[in-house]
Amino acid sequence: MADNKNSRDKKAHDDERRQRERDMAEELERKDEKEPPVDEAELTAFETELESLEFPATGTDVVAAVGDREVESDDGTYTVEELVPDTDEETFGSPTAVRARVQRPTVAAAMKQIVEASEMLPNADLRGSQLEAYEKTLRELKAIDADDDDEGIQAISDWIVERIRDKEKLPGSRAVRRQAAKYCRANGYQIRNDEWLGI
């Protein structure tokens, strides 16, 4: 396709459509999860505030725009700055993507810790499927026992950060899942082989 205004417009339109499809697929994947600890009305108001940003937006853009905004959850009150990494390394394709991150504060705080630790690596690129796999692993840990103090999430995020610092590279998503499964089994949680953590 020639590089002209029409081809650039078509490419931008296709990119937006693919992002919407990914967001919808992620929402469908999450439909079986328990309700997030943040009130739906509050999330809707938060998403409306994000519409002033131009997407895709970096974590730095989000924090600059709404970083001091408080989000109340069952676990307590968090600012967006505590949940979204202040970095240009992570981008959000839409307000829905930011909302999806913020609606599970303990997972969001752990992901922020991981993303910020990965910035220290010279050639690491924590994006796409690896980032999604890390987040899905943490969500699965949260779903296993929603009543605990999120010790599993903290243990695995600490393990990932230690690996980044000690080995100076990102652990593979399978290694993260394997470590999460070890943690679960060591703490008496049953993991079936057909589940995400069942490696």
Feature locations, PLM:
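Short amphipathic alpha-helical segments embedded in low-complexity Lys/Glu-rich regions
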Residues: V63, T79-L83
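Short helix-coil junctions and helix-kink-helix linkers
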Residues: G67-E70, D86
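Short, positively charged loop/turn segments that connect secondary-structure elements
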Residues: E70-V80
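Bromodomain acetyl-lysine reader domains
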Residues: L83-V84, D88, F92, V102, ...
